[in-house]
């Protein structure tokens, strides 16, 4: 879906966007920043910009993405860099807070949004698949022990800690799966396109949606 169409579905124009927040800057997450005017700040963790140019994850950071972000670095007001590992959580707008994620990439951040039903954690790719990593994690015997993926630059223990941190909120929203409601670190319900919104039984949802669909 084109950027204009995706925004238009919510009656939003490109020029209406106050800021663009990136959990991380991989190829499937940070494209089309160049479509936004330089007066619209792109917000990311400073460590993510550094990591994107390090070569550690190769083609997952396309050169045109990295070059555009460097261009923004030298345009006043076009890029906002956070230092979340040092500063702690940073409130970007009223009710929207960014925190260091601690997983997937060295500079990934969680975006915490206050809703009428509690805090929603947009966790990027710290979690890919709620059913197979959290609800019924592959090859894990310990209680509340998530399964990591193979796509990360952090140590496995850091990955597990990052997943547990993301689950320490009322809702968790991975960017390659549907959301979930969480209580005490355990997934208690699944949702689709609204948070908060209609909730579905975890087991029934898993049977209905065998293959996760990318969420916007």
Model-derived regions: residue spans:
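Active-site metal-binding loops of divalent metal-dependent hydrolases
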Residues: 25, 48, 103-105, 124-126, ...
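Metallo-beta-lactamase
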Residues: 1-12, 16-28, 46-100, 147-170, ...
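Well-ordered beta-strand positions
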Residues: 19, 41-42, 171
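Short, conserved loop/helix-junction motifs that constitute active-site signature segments
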Residues: 34-39, 167
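Cap/insert and terminal regions of metallo-dependent hydrolase folds
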Residues: 1-2, 117-216
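Catalytic core of the metallo-beta-lactamase
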Residues: 15, 31, 38, 75-134
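Short catalytic/ligand-binding loop motif for oxyanion handling, primarily in non-cytosolic enzymes
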Residues: 28-31, 51-53, 109, 130, ...
């Amino acid at each position: 879906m084109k950027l204009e169409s995706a925004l238009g579905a919510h009656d939003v124009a490109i020029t209406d966007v106050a800021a663009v927040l990136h959990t991380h800057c991989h190829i499937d997450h940070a494209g089309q920043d160049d479509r936004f005017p330089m007066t619209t700040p792109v917000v990311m963790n400073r460590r993510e910009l550094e990591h994107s140019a390090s070569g550690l994850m190769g083609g997952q950071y396309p050169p045109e993405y990295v070059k555009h972000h460097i261009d923004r670095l030298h345009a006043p007001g076009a890029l906002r860099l956070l230092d979340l590992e040092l500063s702690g959580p940073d409130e970007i707008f009223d009710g929207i807070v960014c925190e260091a994620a601690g997983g997937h990439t060295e500079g990934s951040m969680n975006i915490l949004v206050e809703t009428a039903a509690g805090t929603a954690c947009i966790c990027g790719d710290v979690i890919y698949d709620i059913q197979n990593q959290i609800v019924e994690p592959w090859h894990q015997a310990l209680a509340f022990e998530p399964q990591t993926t193979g796509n990360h630059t952090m140590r496995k223990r850091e990955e597990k800690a990052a997943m547990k941190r993301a689950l320490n909120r009322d809702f968790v929203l991975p960017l390659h799966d549907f959301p979930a409601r969480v209580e005490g670190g355990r997934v208690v319900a699944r949702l689709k396109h609204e948070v908060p919104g209609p909730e579905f039984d975890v087991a029934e949802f898993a049977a209905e949606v065998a293959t996760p669909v990318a969420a916007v």
